[in-house]
Amino acid sequence: MRTPETHAREVAAALPARQVTTVALHRAQDMVLSADIHAGFPSPRFDNSQMDGYALPQCAAGTYLVGPTIAAGDDPIRVLNGPLGAACPIMTGAKVPEGTAAIVPIEHCEPQEFLSPGARITVPETSPGQFIRRTGSDLEEGALLAARDDKLTPVRLAALASQGIDEVEVSRPARILICTGGAEIGHGNAAIPDANAPLLTAMAHRAGIEVAGYIATNDDPQALTHAFAEAIALNHPDAVVTSGGISAGKFEVVRQVLDGWFGHVDQQPGGPQGIATFHDTPVICLPGNPISTLVSFRLFVAPALGWAPEPFRVPLAAGIEGLPHKKQFRRGRVDSHAHILGGASSHLLAQAADATHLIRIPAGQRLEAGEEVEVYPL
């Protein structure tokens, strides 16, 4: 029986190498970088004012002669024709003149207004460097700005833009087909509505994976073979992700159609797993119970084909008994502690609706409140 870690490696090894493409920065949100990016210059690029106020040549309280105004974007050397020698009005973000001891905010001045050159302004005592943003205080030149495999979040995109970067090399989003169904799927009295297709679609989008199309099964191996061939020829996916049809039942149609590895991973839920190919296209086979599908996609598909946040450790809010021989992935939410939500069974979809994380419970252990566990953001 495989461990979850071993199976994750096997899934990744079965997939083609991620292709690299160059995209405009404004189109790169949630994509994954393919190479490190370093800062080409420090940020801020120069000492600048944190406030609208006056640039002072010294920190002493007193009344100062007012000099020319320095606006954001002005070169102080051209405005002043030399170092600072008076109290000069300065705007937020403006480059600080040579010789500036501190910035005093306009609201601390008397009068509280920007005066014309030649007038006099009274200011309180200030501390050296007050309200001056120093060169490189956010990022030094050459520092790592974004690393390979980082997800391009809005803030990371803004940091790249602040360096004058307008395009990036990213891993091309993987394209998948989603295969769900079975003869039981439908809306009759004994039928089951398909929850797995929308679940997998939403999880794929969150992981930065494109859904190219869908395949529905009806427990007929010949029909599924035809559906696979037609959908793959039409959509040219990087992989197919199936849900259900791989366990030990009489109608395990996915397992009947595909050649590959089918076995068990020592985890609950999501024990049955499979890795196969169809006409040279990788097929990742997940179990069909909704929570098993959820857990399996998060652990094995999202990291291999897209992006998933790294797990981290937090203390448990309440004690729990682990299963004797299997690692367990319970659903829960995390604040300062990990809180388990709902029961352990793999059909309890509604009870998992508020979950934000998977909580990993080691096999054969009793964990008490306050002991740390590994959690996986969903």
Question: What is the role of each PLM region?
Answer:
Residues 2, 21-25, 30, 34-35, ...:
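Flexible glycine/proline-rich
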Residues 182-183, 191, 204, 208-314:
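Short glycine/threonine-rich loop/turn motifs
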Residues 89-91, 124, 147, 177-181, ...:
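Short beta-strand segments
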Residues 131-243, 247:
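Phosphate-binding glycine-rich loops and their immediate beta-loop-alpha structural context
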Residues 1-166:
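Phosphate-interaction motifs
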